[in-house]
Amino acid sequence: MSKKRGLSVEEKRTRMMEIFFETKDVFQLKDLEKIAPKEKGITSMSVKEILQSLVDDGMVDSERIGTSNYFWAFPSKALHARKRKLETLEAQFTEVKQKKESLQQCVDKAKVGRQDTEERSKLVEELASLRHRKEELCADLEKYKECDPDVVEEIRQSNKVAKDAVNRWTDNIFAVKSWAKKKFGFEERQIDKNFGIPEDFDYID
């Protein structure tokens, strides 16, 4: 018999938010350490860490009154956090797109007189697809004028799709860099320097 898989960090965060949304109540840490394992399957030892991560991300509010800390969260709070996350993803998207376009210009110059339109066409299609997804995310945001507990799952899914889209662009940039190095002898350090690609440029976790 296979061993039951434990909850991921994201699943724990989602279930913790469900406690707040379903009860619309204010809790102390000790209360959540009792409720979370029983109702949501979150181990009591991980409650504090998960709760703090939600506070750090602006999903849960916290206030110290006397000697005790109190925690609460409402759907409208999640909506604002989602807006900030979307803005962050859009900024990352714009930055990646600009770097991609700069690299594409470099490759286009190097390909003068060469027939290599298939790869270029694929990159153009990917750009159109990602632009369309960005428009969908913005339109989806408008639908959440009134939130309900389902917003937690919606936030997780939308952010995952947007993050995957940005990471696909990161894949494209790495692919173009690799292609340029192999075909034209460009050095990676030179490409990064010429087009302002930071040393820590990488995928979004």
UniProtKB/Swiss-Prot annotation:
Q: Which residues form a coiled coil?
A: 79-147
Superkingdom of origin organism? Eukaryota
Database matches in InterPro entries: LZ3wCH, Mnd1, Mnd1_HTH
Where mainly located?
A: nucleus
Pfam families linked to this entry: LZ3wCH (PF18517), Mnd1 (PF03962)
Give the CC-aspect GO terms.
nucleus
Q: Which GO terms describe its biological process?
A: reciprocal meiotic recombination
One of the record's GO molecular function terms: double-stranded DNA binding
Q: Where in the cell is it found?
A: Nucleus
Please provide the record's keywords in A-Z order.
Coiled coil, DNA recombination, Meiosis, Nucleus
Report the sequence similarity comment from the record: Belongs to the MND1 family.
Q: Tell me, what does this protein do in biology? A: Required for proper homologous chromosome pairing and efficient cross-over and intragenic recombination during meiosis. Stimulates both dmc1- and rad51-mediated homologous strand assimilation, which is required for the resolution of meiotic double-strand breaks.
Q: Report the protein name in the record.
A: Meiotic nuclear division protein 1 homolog
In the UniProt record, the gene name given for this protein reads mnd1
